[in-house]
Amino acid sequence: MAKIVKVIGREIIDSRGNPTVEAEVHLEGGFVGLAAAPSGASTGSREALELRDGDKARFLGKGVLKAVSAVNNEIAHAIVGKDASNQAEIDQIMIDLDGTDNKSKFGANAILAVSLANAKAAAASKGLPLYAHIAELNGTPGVYSMPLPMMNIINGGEHADNNVDIQEFMIQPVGASTLKEALRIGAEVFHNLAKVLKAKGLNTAVGDEGGFAPNLASNADALACIKEAVEKAGYVLGKDVTLAMDCASSEFYNKDNGLYEMKGEGKSFTSQEFTHYLEGLCKEYPIVSIEDGQDESDWEGFAYQTKVLGDKVQLVGDDLFVTNTKILSRGIENGIANSILIKFNQIGSLTETLAAIKMAKDAGYTAVISHRSGETEDATIADLAVGTAAGQIKTGSMSRSDRVAKYNQLIRIEEALAAAGTPAPFNGRKEVKGQA
């Protein structure tokens, strides 16, 4: 038995200079797990609650001392003495103790930090790397794959202080044969993009996720800059590198008039018009994945978008599904989208996250493991991607150590599995829905 003997919570600082929750779980034998909760900027309304103190005298109201107190008191008292290797039981104890539908009593940031720290401690007690322990929890021991990165190299929307409406313009190095090669391709495109932007007299400051955040005349201009960078790096767009976008459409959807208002380029669209606007971009550029291409509540719009684009483009639900099996099951039943973005702080525990990944895969949906715009050096999502053989990961650009920490962990994992004589496959383009 991997007996829990101590649980510690503390307030630390994330990549945006805001507080977040870090937890330690200590086991008999001296094994310790340490994990921190990430935080989003563009958040779905149905996400589990991130508990903030609201005290304007501390961190502009964004302190997390209430959540930390829950870790150090109620949660600690409930799980000390329990077996850390029983992840589902530990998570359920915390969920039941919280007693709310959206984890608003303790905060999903408190419960998740403990959930992940517990998994890390249990892995250490078994002498396993975290990804191997996660594979066992997932019911797929020894089944791994290296994820195809989805690299956000131009930031807009809520992730940047610029005039670009679409939140993320990403590249996927689909022509790579290994994860490490994919990262090299991504880095080379990233550096060439800096040269392209500088030559145009554009800003090369970076946004929350490490991508560039220039002011551009249109969203199509962002794609054109990336195309030029890919070619300058010596790669073929559509063959070696494909494109992906996160529209984060809820951020520019006007609920009063039902229009998608893209103020950066002075255009407004109805739901169907916006789908055809995206369809036009897909015809001009090899865009193979679109995330949140409609408002989170516009299920009719998503159904239409899936009908128009779903057979040729991966349509990822983020704010739409919020890593929640109840909402995902409704989407599956109604043929809405064909992929889910997995952010474990949207749901608030590792067990519930694994359930969402399983439900998606069982239904033929892809699962893209994702960071948040507010991150720490915690690299758990790298192990989650490998341990569930999810196939794709979205963890920012090739700058900012809070992003690169995840890529470096993936390099270590790929290397370790190869050294053990059990290399994990890197399937590249085949991982993207509709691209096999």
UniProtKB/Swiss-Prot annotation:
Pathway: Carbohydrate degradation; glycolysis; pyruvate from D-glyceraldehyde 3-phosphate: step 4/5. Its cofactor is Mg(2+). GO terms for biological process: glycolytic process. It is an enzyme of class 4 (lyase). Its EC number is 4.2.1.11. Gene3D superfamilies: Enolase-like C-terminal domain, Enolase-like, N-terminal domain. InterPro entries: Enolase, Enolase-like_C_sf, Enolase-like_N, Enolase_C, Enolase_CS, Enolase_N. It catalyses: (2R)-2-phosphoglycerate = phosphoenolpyruvate + H2O. Its main location: cytoplasm. Keywords: Cytoplasm, Glycolysis, Lyase, Magnesium, Metal-binding, Secreted. The keyword Protein transport does not apply. Belongs to the enolase family. Catalyzes the reversible conversion of 2-phosphoglycerate (2-PG) into phosphoenolpyruvate (PEP). It is essential for the degradation of carbohydrates via glycolysis. NCBIfam families: eno. PANTHER family: ENOLASE. This is Enolase.
